[in-house]
């Protein structure tokens, strides 16, 4: 156990896996059956269910993933493995039925809904993130109840704008796009504001350069794009982080280190970028450099338990 229950927040799919197992133990029914009987059936959600790879589903979306040289099919995943943490399929139309039912007593009584939608630690309620839209964003002051998720080849975001009973659902079958920014643009349209122009992702362009011309050319391209087109691309720290981990997974440790070092240069106040650089140094066998960067990560983000654990392991070797 990482900490005393109720003292900190840490999202973990294992919690939802256990909740599914508890439901099965208490009711004597499978999780899939419970979903059909309690939610999908009563709400007429005919295009939602527990996914089985062998089933033929009309219009089933295929998942892809961004790699250095382009887009590839996402690796196969046996959907019995994520279980209650992520084995469902659905549609925007069905999720709208579910969303609207949450404003009634069809699924959950008011007392339980109050608990569901009350934030506890770090804005998180019972399975929902509950926040107020900042004053500088469209829909300022409204409560947004949301959740996102991802699995091989897919990522999603749902935002419930409870003041107006509006719903934003984004399904993406090539993970990597900033769905939060997309949702912000949709909110702008809903509230008759001008949405910000979409920004191009960095990974496809830099990835192609990495494959064809090497890491030095990719770093130079990044600097040139930021100089000449600062508003046209998404230059947040996650873009370079994603690129670095792609390289790390392919065993290109030195190239990954170069990309992570660029990210540290760009975002020196982020504990996460130092954490990533430390991981790359550790994988490359550069123990002291890994220790130095894990320490810096913890200095900037003392709550980073993973960095603390990795640092302890390295210092004990």
Model-based region annotation:
Residues 1-152:
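Short, surface-exposed loop or secondary-structure junction motifs
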Residues 237, 271-272, 305-306:
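Helix-start (N-cap) detector for alpha-helical repeat units in TPR-like alpha-solenoids
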């Amino acid at each position: 156990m990482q900490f005393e229950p109720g003292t900190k927040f840490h999202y973990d799919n294992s919690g939802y896996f256990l909740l599914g197992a508890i439901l099965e133990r208490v009711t004597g029914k499978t999780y899939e059956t419970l979903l059909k009987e309690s939610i999908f059936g009563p709400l007429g959600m005919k295009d939602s269910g527990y996914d089985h790879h062998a089933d033929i589903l009309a219009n089933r979306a295929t998942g892809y993933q961004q790699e250095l040289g382009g887009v590839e099919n996402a690796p196969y995943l046996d959907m019995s493995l994520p279980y209650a943490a992520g084995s469902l399929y659905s549609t925007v139309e069905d999720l709208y039925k579910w969303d609207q039912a949450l404003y009634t007593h069809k699924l959950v009584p008011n007392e339980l809904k109050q608990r569901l939608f009350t934030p506890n630690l770090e804005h998180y309620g019972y399975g929902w993130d509950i926040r107020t839209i900042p004053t500088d964003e469209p829909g300022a002051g409204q409560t947004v109840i949301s959740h996102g998720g991802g699995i091989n080849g897919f990522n999603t975001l749902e935002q419930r704008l409870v003041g107006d009973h509006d719903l934003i659902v984004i399904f993406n079958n090539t993970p990597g796009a900033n769905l939060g920014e997309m949702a912000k643009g949709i909110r702008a349209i809903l509230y008759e504001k001008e949405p910000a122009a979409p920004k191009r992702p960095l990974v496809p362009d830099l990835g192609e350069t990495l494959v064809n011309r090497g890491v030095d050319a990719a770093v130079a391209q990044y600097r040139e794009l930021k100089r000449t087109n600062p508003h046209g691309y998404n230059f947040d720290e996650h873009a370079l982080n994603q690129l670095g981990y792609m390289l790390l997974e392919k065993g290109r440790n030195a190239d990954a280190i170069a990309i992570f070092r660029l990210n540290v240069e760009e975002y020196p106040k982020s504990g996460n970028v130092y954490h990533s650089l430390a991981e790359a140094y550790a994988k490359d066998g550069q123990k002291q450099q890994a220790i130095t960067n894990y320490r810096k990560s913890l200095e900037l983000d003392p709550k980073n338990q993973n960095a603390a654990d990795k640092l302890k392991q390295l210092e004990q070797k």
